């Protein structure tokens, strides 16, 4: 909490509080075509210009004069960036090191790729696939392996990154619809279509708020101060982060999951830490 710089807004499916991250990638709005490396693209921010709720996050990135917002679903999210007037507005997609790929598809305003980064204990075929679809055509793009810029639409190697650019008016908003899958790129796209589709940012935000209000509203407390209420519900929110859904819904509407034990795609549900934190939960698991 003491940090005052942001290098990226990270998508994560952290498997537990003690295993660190798992197949993560980051998305960072920037102003300037040379601001790709994490040190170059980082921006100062203040917690006074930040809003953090279970269903919504917003922050003003001072170095880029950009407001970044996020609203989640189970396996997807919608990000909205409010840019200044610039012909060098952009978004950097960082698939991180230890083996990754990015591919830019300008005709569909889409970036896809995969990440293999993890903290150990995964099968050899472990990958987190992602798809990012923008609502504005690209004015340009670049792809990198580490600090080496590559020709073409794709980068695959130790550390793949992509940057896409836009010409924006002051106050213009660019929306990115994002989803991921541990199964395949096709499944990531299916997750995006199923959970977000054409819904706009405010719709996804409202849906997320409704779901979190239902969860946190299951317990009502009284007799405390506002600060005590805030502490209680903050802790209640954190307690609901695990167990989490590790399964996805296939084209036939059936639950399937990537097994972190043998690397196979198996039928049925899987929920991380379910036996430890909720041993009597009735939902079927495999």
Region locations from a protein language model:
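Single conserved hydrophobic/aromatic residue that forms the stacking wall/gate
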Residues: 274-286
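Accessory carbohydrate-recognition regions in carbohydrate-active enzymes
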Residues: 1-273, 277
């Amino acid at each position: 909490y003491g940090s005052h710089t942001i290098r990226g807004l990270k998508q994560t499916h952290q498997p537990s509080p003690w295993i660190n991250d798992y197949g993560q990638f980051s998305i960072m709005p920037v102003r300037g075509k040379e601001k790709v490396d994490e040190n170059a693209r980082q921006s100062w921010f203040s917690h006074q210009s930040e809003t953090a709720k279970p269903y919504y996050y917003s922050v003003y990135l001072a170095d880029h004069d950009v407001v970044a917002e996020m609203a989640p679903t189970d396996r997807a999210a919608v990000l909205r960036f409010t840019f200044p007037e610039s012909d060098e507005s952009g978004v950097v997609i960082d698939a991180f090191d230890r083996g990754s790929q990015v591919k830019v598809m300008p005709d569909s305003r889409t970036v896809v790729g995969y990440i293999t980064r993890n903290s150990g204990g995964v099968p050899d075929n472990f990958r987190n696939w992602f798809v990012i679809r923008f609502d504005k055509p690209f004015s340009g793009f670049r792809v990198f392996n580490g600090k080496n810029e590559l020709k073409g639409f794709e980068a695959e190697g130790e550390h793949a990154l992509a940057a896409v650019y836009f010409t924006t008016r002051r106050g213009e908003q660019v929306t990115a619809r994002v989803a991921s899958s541990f199964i395949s790129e096709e499944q990531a796209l299916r997750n995006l279509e199923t959970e977000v589709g054409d819904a706009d940012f405010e719709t996804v935000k409202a849906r997320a708020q409704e779901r979190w209000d239902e969860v946190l509203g299951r317990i009502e407390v009284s007799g405390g101060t506002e600060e005590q209420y805030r502490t209680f519900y903050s802790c209640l929110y954190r307690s609901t982060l695990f167990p989490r859904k590790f399964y996805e819904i296939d084209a036939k509407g059936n639950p399937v999951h990537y097994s972190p034990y043998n690397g196979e795609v198996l039928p049925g549900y899987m929920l991380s830490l379910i036996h430890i934190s909720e041993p009597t939960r009735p939902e079927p698991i495999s």
